[in-house]
């Protein structure tokens, strides 16, 4: 790969094409997004998201930006947990902004989102977020960073929009560290997920890309270094389900 090309799954394509090609993938799977995550995680993505929310520990008055937020399910979990705290302790309600470059993904989540008064949907690019500096307490991105063309640029944007003391949480598929688990998951991913995608959505190609994009994503240690390079402190990560997914976090200090 040279500076003029970038990975799109296992393909090498011109850098300027990736954003549109990724958008086309998610246009094609928007109506089946939750089923897609079920297929790629054995249905465990819901548990991973709940564990992520527990780690975040949402509080009243906090402002969340959920980048690549799609249908808004993570933002909904954030607001629900923050509201439970508010009911016990008092204070103002939390607010969430679901930001996604793909309007079809945002539209797919309209009917699913509760607490509509406290949640807004914004069409925007992770590499150039439509938010001012120092405006958010928490920024999340779940299963989205691997699809971003320039991940380092996006991480720098995340740092920009967070307030001092703000927290970043990145949930992403990863490569299992155990060789036996990796072999099993690779066999499942490459042999069955595209077939499931074809069965559920008539779209094997998009699911093939999503599987390949996981294998092209940096290791846990390398991605942690990328987060630190963007300015974050106290960067750490936790593997879920043997490393099928990983939660990364860091602070803007």
Where are these regions (language model features)?
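C-terminal alpha-helical "lid/dimerization" subdomain adjacent to the S-adenosyl-L-methionine
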Residues: 171-226, 230, 236
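N-terminal auxiliary segments of SAM/dcSAM-dependent transferases
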Residues: 1-24
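A short SAM/SAH-binding and catalytic strip from SAM-dependent methyltransferases
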Residues: 137-151, 174
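Core SAM-dependent methyltransferase catalytic element
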Residues: 224, 230-253
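A short acidic, Gly/Pro-enriched loop at the edge of an enzyme's catalytic core
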Residues: 127-138
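A short glycine-rich, Lys/Arg-flanked "PGG" loop and its adjoining helix->strand segment in the class I
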Residues: 152-167
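Class I SAM-dependent methyltransferase SAM/SAH-binding core
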Residues: 63-128
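Conserved alpha-helix/loop element of class I SAM-dependent methyltransferases that forms part
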Residues: 28, 32, 42-62, 77
């Amino acid at each position: 790969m040279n500076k003029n090309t970038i990975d799109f799954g296992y393909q090498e394509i011109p850098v300027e094409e990736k954003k549109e090609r990724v958008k086309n993938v998610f246009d094609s799977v928007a109506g089946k997004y939750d089923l897609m995550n079920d297929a790629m995680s054995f249905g465990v993505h819901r548990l991973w998201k709940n564990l992520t929310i527990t780690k975040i520990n949402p509080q009243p008055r906090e402002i969340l930006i959920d980048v690549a937020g799609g249908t808004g399910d993570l933002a909904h979990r954030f607001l629900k947990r923050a509201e439970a705290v508010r009911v016990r302790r008092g204070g103002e309600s939390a607010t969430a902004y679901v930001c996604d470059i793909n309007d079809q993904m945002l539209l797919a989540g309209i009917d699913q989102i509760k607490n509509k008064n406290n949640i807004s949907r914004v069409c925007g690019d992770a590499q150039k977020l439509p938010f001012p500096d120092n405006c958010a307490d928490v920024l999340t991105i779940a299963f989205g960073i691997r699809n971003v063309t320039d991940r380092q640029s996006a991480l720098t944007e995340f740092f920009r929009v967070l307030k001092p003391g703000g927290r970043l949480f990145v949930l992403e598929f990863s490569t299992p560290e155990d060789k036996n688990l990796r072999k099993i998951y690779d066999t499942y991913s490459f042999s069955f997920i595209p077939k499931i995608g074809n069965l559920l959505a008539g779209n094997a190609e998009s699911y093939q890309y999503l599987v390949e994009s996981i294998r092209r994503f940096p290791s846990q240690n390398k991605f942690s270094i990328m987060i630190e390079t963007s300015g974050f402190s106290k960067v750490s990560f936790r593997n879920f389900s043997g490393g099928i997914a990983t939660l990364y976090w860091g602070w803007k200090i």
